[in-house]
């Protein structure tokens, strides 16, 4: 397989502008955005960087939570940390940055399932964090993380449990039934899909969630139903 083309100078500038960091070693940005389906036999891709970025992200978020939520217990901090470093949150950051426009992939990426497409977007964010860390150190990586995670950490719903788990337990306790999720619509290209999912519980009015992955849309639908039924307090933070 031929090595994928490097990002153009214009593409690099667009990515650097939105992330708020300008790379010293431009090749690090290229490596961070190269999916395994596009790599040459001995080339580098973001999977190794993702391994490192996952650890850097966890440290930066844990440190931030420790400083901000001084009265929180270890268990409460862990719930927030797990949510903030989850694939869903990382993928949401990727969507905010619109990294899907710049990830270099091969034809095989079209065969990925919806869940794996979410993981692709999540992993590339972690690889980007690692690339910044290797390029300029922990302070630069921390600045990037805080730019995109600090507000998320402060949201009212940041310490919530997983919405689907919460909804399932509530439905079992109140109605002795299991929530049913259905994909009502899928639109958009393979690299940037949009899913509309409905969730039904017995005779209750269904709720709908829309997101760029089936999994995230299910979470959105579950969240809306929990808030509508008063199980959760509606978050006043904007998404």
UniProtKB/Swiss-Prot annotation:
Query: According to the UniProt entry, what is the EC number of this protein?
Result: 3.1.26.3
Q: Which residues form a coiled coil?
A: none
Q: Which CDD domains match?
A: DSRM_RNAse_III_family, RIBOc
InterPro entries the record matches: dsRBD_dom, RNase_III, RNase_III_dom, RNase_III_sf
Residues that coordinate or bind Mg(2+): 50, 123, 126
Provide this UniProt record's keywords sorted from A to Z: Cytoplasm, Endonuclease, Hydrolase, Magnesium, Metal-binding, mRNA processing, Nuclease, RNA-binding, rRNA processing, rRNA-binding, tRNA processing
Catalytic activity, reaction form: Endonucleolytic cleavage to 5'-phosphomonoester
Annotated Gene Ontology cellular components are:
cytoplasm
Q: What Gene3D superfamilies would the database entry show? A: 3.30.160.20, Ribonuclease III domain
Q: Which residues form the active site?
A: 54, 126
Gene Ontology terms for molecular function: double-stranded RNA binding; metal ion binding; ribonuclease III activity; rRNA binding
* HAMAP family to which the protein is assigned, alphabetical: RNase_III
Subunit field text:
Homodimer.
Residue ranges occupied by any RNase III domain in the UniProt entry: 12-137
The principal localisation class reads cytoplasm
Location of the protein in the cell: Cytoplasm
Instruction: Outline what the protein does.
Output: Digests double-stranded RNA. Involved in the processing of primary rRNA transcript to yield the immediate precursors to the large and small rRNAs (23S and 16S). Processes some mRNAs, and tRNAs when they are encoded in the rRNA operon. Processes pre-crRNA and tracrRNA of type II CRISPR loci if present in the organism.
Q: Which organism is it from?
A: Allorhizobium ampelinum (strain ATCC BAA-846 / DSM 112012 / S4)
Q: Which family does it belong to?
A: Belongs to the ribonuclease III family.
Q: What is this protein called?
A: Ribonuclease 3
Residue ranges constituting the DRBM domain according to the UniProt record: 162-231
Q: What is one Gene Ontology biological process annotated in the Swiss-Prot or TrEMBL record?
A: mRNA processing
Which cofactors, if any, are listed as required?
Mg(2+)
């Amino acid at each position: 397989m031929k090595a994928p083309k490097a990002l153009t100078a214009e593409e690099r500038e667009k990515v650097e502008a939105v992330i708020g960091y300008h790379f010293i070693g431009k090749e690090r940005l290229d490596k961070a955005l190269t999916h395994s389906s596009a790599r040459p036999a001995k080339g580098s891709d973001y999977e190794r960087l993702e391994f490192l970025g996952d650890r850097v992200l966890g440290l930066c978020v844990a440190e931030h939570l420790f400083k901000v939520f001084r009265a929180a217990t270890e268990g409460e901090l862990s719930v927030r940390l797990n949510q903030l470093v989850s694939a869903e949150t990382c993928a949401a950051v990727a969507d905010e940055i619109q990294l899907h426009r710049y990830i270099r992939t091969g034809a095989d990426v079209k065969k990925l399932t919806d869940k794996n497409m979410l993981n692709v977007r999540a992993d590339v964010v972690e690889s980007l964090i690692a690339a910044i860390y290797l390029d300029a150190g922990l302070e630069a990586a921390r600045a990037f993380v805080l730019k995109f995670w600090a507000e998320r950490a402060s949201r009212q719903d940041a310490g919530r449990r997983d919405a689907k788990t919460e909804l399932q337990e509530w439905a079992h306790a109140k109605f002795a039934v299991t929530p049913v999720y259905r994909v009502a619509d899928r639109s958009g290209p393979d690299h940037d899909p949009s899913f509309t999912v409905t969730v039904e519980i017995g005779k209750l009015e269904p709720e709908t969630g829309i997101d760029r992955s089936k999994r995230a849309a299910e979470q959105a639908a579950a969240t809306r139903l929990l808030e509508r039924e008063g199980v959760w307090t509606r978050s006043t933070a904007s998404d």
